[in-house]
Regions:
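Conserved glycine-rich cofactor-binding loop
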Residues: 13, 20-22
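Conserved glycine-rich Rossmann-like NAD(P)H-binding loop of the short-chain dehydrogenase/reductase
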Residues: 34-50
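The beta1-alpha1 cofactor-binding region of Rossmann-like NAD(H)/NADP(H)-dependent oxidoreductases
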Residues: 63-74, 106
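Substrate-binding pocket helix/loop in short-chain dehydrogenase/reductase
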Residues: 100-101, 105-110, 139
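Active-site helix of classical SDR
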Residues: 124, 160, 168
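Alpha-helical segment proximal to the catalytic Tyr-Lys
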Residues: 129, 173-174
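Residue(s) in the substrate-gating loop at a strand-loop-helix junction
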Residues: 144
Length: 181
């Protein structure tokens, strides 16, 4: 049996944040190549355009700032327009600020928590009703080793990724009864 048969995502609609580079772009590339319709979200539109031009499969891009909590419901609605209601959400967007705890500013703390914790939660919350209506959904939140191991120069990032781990467990408790894991 070929990998394409084992990993066939035809008929699935995926929203992937942080898709302009790194792990998010890798996930978007693989899911599109295996048949999912992919909505790639990131801040850098030029990088999204470059990725989309080379991606195999059906893709759409959405340039958006996920750190703006007030825009997240609108971003989720916009992500649902190209292909319909998503049933896969991969939260790969994130920021890793590295500075000693004494040097962390309010703005740096807020940016890290908004992008790494609030964005995944509020995007999921906005997309879950559609997943629930379909009776199936998958939400993948990227965490980090720093969620379990403290680093002197990574307090805001480590705290955010610890929160992502716990949030993911709570999401599973809340939504698995609806087929959303």
């Amino acid at each position: 049996m070929f990998a394409s048969q084992l990993f066939d995502l035809s008929g699935k609609i995926a929203v992937i944040t942080g898709a302009s580079s790194g792990l998010g772009q890798g996930a978007a590339t693989v899911l599109a190549a295996h048949g999912a319709q992919v909505v790639a979200i990131a801040r850098r539109e030029e990088k999204l355009n470059s990725w989309s031009a080379s991606a195999q499969g059906e893709t759409s891009i959405l340039a958006a700032d996920l750190s703006d909590r007030s825009a997240l419901a609108d971003i989720a609605a916009e992500a649902s327009r190209p292909f319909g209601t998503p049933n896969i959400l991969i939260n790969a967007a994130g920021i890793n600020t590295r500075q000693p705890a004494d040097d962390v500013t309010d703005a740096q703390w807020d940016l890290t928590q908004n992008l790494n914790v609030a964005a995944p939660f509020f995007l999921a919350k906005a997309l879950v009703p559609g997943m629930r209506a379909k009776g199936w959904g998958r939400i993948i939140n990227y965490a980090s080793l720093q969620s379990r191991r403290a680093f002197a120069n990574g307090i805001s990032y480590g705290v955010s990724k610890g929160a992502v781990e716990q949030m993911t467990r709570a999401m599973a408790e809340a939504w698995s009864c609806d087929g959303i894991t």
